[in-house]
Swiss-Prot record:
Catalyzes the ATP-dependent conversion of 7-carboxy-7-deazaguanine (CDG) to 7-cyano-7-deazaguanine (preQ(0)). It catalyses: 7-carboxy-7-deazaguanine + NH4(+) + ATP = 7-cyano-7-deazaguanine + ADP + phosphate + H2O + H(+). Zn(2+) binds at residues 206, 221, 224, 227. This is 7-cyano-7-deazaguanine synthase. It is an enzyme of class 6 (ligase). SUPFAM superfamilies: Adenine nucleotide alpha hydrolases-like. The gene is queC. Binds 1 zinc ion per subunit. Its EC number is 6.3.4.20. The lineage of its organism: Bacteria, Pseudomonadati, Pseudomonadota, Alphaproteobacteria, Maricaulales. It comes from Maricaulis maris (strain MCS10) (Caulobacter maris). Keywords: ATP-binding, Ligase, Metal-binding, Nucleotide-binding, Queuosine biosynthesis, Zinc.
Length: 243
């Protein structure tokens, strides 16, 4: 387990884009280790798996209880209502539609511009709250082909937001080049078995919002793309751990 007694950036604060899923929970732990003060922001855009909004609360409280040194750094949580955006960004995440590949090569779970909107709104909040760092769980390794998860997209957003706000904006993406097995490994490095257990039990990834089926890797339907990535990554990580 990594020593978390002293932040790497003792005078810096960060705002974490926090959905309550595996990736953002790992990013929150990463930020709490690294920065002196961390706040979180979530977005309610009419997603079908609205259960993630309650998962956010469980993960935050679990982190504070299990890791008091992180709890001391964990600040306020904000939830932004983006129902209007969800209404125009129709996808299988916001409507009762089949999860399948589309003619353009993207899955029907792709919400057009989602990360662009999230980062723009988060940057406005960060500006008001005095944060120079945004932390997001975007990843171009296990990302289902979403173009707004690529690092070149994030770099372009970082430049645009910095110019538009006339301030230095850093978008940190600690998972950008990690597959799901490496993401599980990072969580274990950050918080050991306690953090792994919290992510397995309390975070939510399933596109269908299933919380009735418990697997070794957590709750979910087990066959949507998000569950498959999480399950396969969990198995690969466990197989890589020395007996």
């Amino acid at each position: 387990m990594t020593d978390t007694s002293t932040p790497d950036h003792a005078n810096r604060t960060a705002l974490v884009l926090f959905s309550g899923g595996q990736d953002s929970a790992t990013c929150l732990a990463w930020a709490l280790q690294r920065y002196a003060r961390v706040e979180t922001v979530g977005f309610d855009y009419g997603q079908r798996h609205h259960v993630e909004m309650t998962a956010r609360e469980r993960v935050r409280s679990g982190l504070a209880a299990s890791f008091p040194h992180w709890g001391d750094r964990l600040g306020e949580d904000f939830v932004i209502d983006l129902a209007g955006y969800g209404a125009i960004a129709d996808s299988a995440l916001t409507a009762d539609r089949a999860i399948e590949m589309q003619a353009n090569g993207l899955p029907s779970t792709f919400v057009p511009g989602r990360n662009l909107v999230f980062l723009t709104v988060a940057s406005a909040l960060a500006y008001r709250r005095g944060h120079g760092v945004l932390v997001g769980g975007m990843c171009e390794t296990d990302f289902s082909g979403y173009p707004d998860c690529r690092r070149n997209t994030i770099d372009a957003m970082q430049t645009a937001l910095g110019l538009g706000l006339e301030m230095a904006v850093e978008i940190a993406t600690p998972l950008m080049h990690l597959d799901k097995a490496a993401t599980w490994a990072l969580a274990h490095q950050l918080g050991g078995d306690a953090l792994i257990g919290l992510i397995e039990e309390d975070s939510h990834t399933c596109y269908r919002g299933e919380r009735g089926k418990r697997h070794a890797w957590g709750y979910g339907c087990g066959d949507c793309p998000a569950c498959e990535l999480r399950a396969n990554g969990h198995a690969a990580w466990q197989n890589s751990v020395p007996a």
